Amino acid sequence: MGIPFPAGKALDALAAESDSTDSFSVKLRELSFSLSGVENQVKQRLERGVPAADVARFALNTVVRLIRRVTERAQKEYPGLPVLFSGGVASNALLRREMGEQVLFAEPRYSTDNAMGVAILTLRALERGLI
């Protein structure tokens, strides 16, 4: 789609240019899922010449609706357990709007692409003396 990495902010801005409500239904197995079908759908839409803004909105609509379903299912399975969103996806405007008050969001400075993963990998590398 021609957006820079990390892509979170750019994808958010691109998707905001579209009012598409299209999404792909991702299958859930308990609290597990795979996004490979979504990836294929995104590629196919781009190959068909669907505008990048509509493809971005499609991808975000799909992921946000999936996260909502998984979160609601987890909250039913574990009532009263708080849910905290952090990392790159947690800074997405559509997700924040959709999830509203039912979850907690980390501050934007803690919600950057791969922040948690990079921190964990760095700690492990330090512990092993690799850096």
Where are these predicted regions, by residue range?
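Acidic, glycine-enriched active-site microenvironments
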Residues: 1-131
